[in-house]
UniProtKB/Swiss-Prot annotation:
Quaternary structure annotation from Swiss-Prot or TrEMBL: Monomer.
Motif position, 'HIGH' region: 35-45
Cofactor: Zn(2+)
Keywords for the protein's UniProt record, in alphabetical order: Aminoacyl-tRNA synthetase, ATP-binding, Cytoplasm, Ligase, Metal-binding, Nucleotide-binding, Protein biosynthesis, Zinc
Reactions mediated catalytically: tRNA(Cys) + L-cysteine + ATP = L-cysteinyl-tRNA(Cys) + AMP + diphosphate
Enzyme class: ligase
Family in the record: Belongs to the class-I aminoacyl-tRNA synthetase family.
InterPro entries membership: Cys-tRNA-ligase, Cys-tRNA-synt_Ia_DALR, Cys-tRNA/MSH_ligase, Rossmann-like_a/b/a_fold, tRNA-synt_1_cat_dom, tRNAsynth_Ia_anticodon-bd
Principal location listed in the UniProt entry: cytoplasm
Location in or out of the cell: Cytoplasm
Organism of derivation: Mycobacterium marinum (strain ATCC BAA-535 / M)
Name of the coding gene: cysS
One term of GO molecular function: zinc ion binding
Lineage: Bacteria, Bacillati, Actinomycetota, Actinomycetes, Mycobacteriales
Protein name (record): Cysteine--tRNA ligase
Length: 468
């Protein structure tokens, strides 16, 4: 079933749900702000990936060719500070946690992006964008930095609703700024930090500049949808719009923002110390169950984490899984069929996943009744529809990828028990100042392909390479 009609999406810029009409018929271009790879991914990070993976899967199922770009911010103040505190090269720190994010996305079967550009690989395009802004009178150099002149762009604030007079960029006081409402495009070089040559001296890119340059490189001067967390609306996305459109680009036509994962009403974040890392969560539930949970709320809603809510999601997923296994054992092979009209109507209405899930569970109830009555044909039809609908949500229990992931998750849980024991021995050796033994344990883990990183939250481990 691949008709292309009726999709409506909530556009943050319009403040309303709009009919989705792509720039090119049959093609959709999407840019998702990806991770700043400073530490282990937690469920707040990955919720965005799951939410917009559902959008991508639905568009593809509707017959669209989707170009999906998700960037990696691999140069940033937080990365530099954390790497310096750990006495490790910044690029090694970024690469380590980029692998951790990739592993998290893979574990939850988030489809790989069409391209995944790193900020450090696109400095040339960033410099070219700054040059265009300076030529057009929207940017200026000062004190070794380059800034965007906010007052030069009359439409500033339209996405977020901020009035120019009330703007605070959160960058602190900078001597080179003409106006403290201006934001940094390029940061002048500092001792010990990475830098690149430019017409304004050596330095590194500002955060907002990176996404504008990478989106243009891969999707062109104008594209369909820009996605990200609602915390990025201001200043990040507001500044992206300003610098891109001031440079003459149309930029994104629709803006979609997902809600936070909260705990006790507070946004999940490392600074608050209330994060739940993906590796930790996958010791508690299976990958498919975690994906089901993260995708179960409407993408624009806050997702309040609790053990009860997580278990409710697990129970709901297991109910679907058990029904499909029951049908398969009694009626034979369950193929992927067609979704129901009510499921399609739900996703066409701004990706209303809770309503779509209600339709899945309604179909499951019908299928169970048919199976109990001995009507295997009707039960198979229900099961086939459920496979199609759960597949759109990325968690079809009968997909062979999930069965292999369940086995991998169990294996990783066993490995974690062994690694944690080694890390406890290493910590004891360090407390006793037995540095030789501590190094021996770390090297033993490294030779087994396990990378250990000492963080403020204690040692963290990742499967690295082949141990060579």
């Amino acid at each position: 079933m691949t008709e292309r009609a009726g999709l409506r999406l909530h556009d943050t810029a319009a403040g309303a749900v709009r009919d989705f009409v792509p720039l090119r018929e049959g093609h959709v271009s999407i840019y998702l702000c990806g991770a700043t790879v400073q530490g282990l991914p937690h469920i707040g990070h990955v919720r965005s990936g799951v939410a917009f993976d559902i959008l991508r899967r639905w568009l593809m199922a509707r017959g669209f060719d989707v170009a999906f770009i998700r960037n990696v911010t691999d140069i940033d103040d937080k990365i530099l500070n954390k790497a310096a505190a750990a006495e490790r090269p910044w690029w090694e720190w970024a690469a380590t946690y980029e692998r951790a994010f990739t592993a998290a996305y893979d574990a939850l079967d988030v489809l790989p992006p069409s391209a995944e550009p790193r900020a450090t690989g696109h400095v040339t395009q960033m410099v070219e964008l700054i040059e265009r802004l300076i030529e057009r009178g929207h940017a200026y150099a000062g004190g070794g930095d380059v800034y965007f002149d906010v007052l030069s762009y009359p439409d500033y604030g339209q996405l977020s609703g901020h009035k120019v007079d009330d703007v605070h960029q959160g960058e602190g006081v900078a001597t080179g700024k003409r106006d403290q409402r201006d934001f940094t495009l390029w940061k002048g070089a500092k001792p010990g930090e990475p830098s690149w040559p430019t017409p304004w001296g050596r330095g590194r890119p500002g955060w907002h500049l990176e996404c504008s340059a990478m989106a243009r490189t891969y999707l062109g001067a104008q594209f369909d949808i820009h996605c990200g967390g609602m915390d990025l609306i201001f200043p990040h996305h507001e500044n992206e719009i300003a610098q891109s459109r001031a440079a003459g680009d149309g930029f994104a036509r629709y803006w979609l923002h997902n809600g936070w994962v909260t705990m006790g009403g507070e946004k999940m974040s490392k600074s608050l110390g209330n994060v739940l890392a993906i590796p930790t969560m996958l010791q508690r539930v299976r990958p498919a169950e975690l994906r089901y949970y993260l995708g179960s709320a409407h993408y624009r809603s806050m997702l309040e984490f609790s053990d009860i809510a997580l278990q409710d999601a697990v129970n709901a997923y297991v109910g679907v899984e058990e029904f499909l296994h029951r049908v398969r054992s009694r009626a034979g092979v369950v193929v992927v069929g067609d979704w129901t009209p009510r499921f399609a109507a739900a996703l066409d209405d701004d990706l209303s996943v809770p309503i779509a899930l209600a339709e899945i569970h309604h179909t499951r109830a019908e299928g169970n009744r048919a199976l109990d009555a001995g009507d295997h044909d009707a039960a198979l039809q229900s099961a086939s529809s459920i496979r199609a609908m759960m597949g759109i949500l990325g968690c079809d229990p009968l997909d062979e990828r999930w069965e292999s992931r369940d086995e991998t998750s169990a294996a990783l849980a066993a490995v974690d028990v062994l690694v944690q024991a080694e890390l406890e021995n290493r910590q004891k050796a360090r407390e006793e100042r037995n540095w030789a033994l501590a190094d021996e344990i770390r090297n033993r883990l490294k030779n087994a392909g396990i990378e250990v990183t000492d963080t403020a939250d204690g040692p963290q481990w990742l499967l690295g390479g082949d141990g060579k």
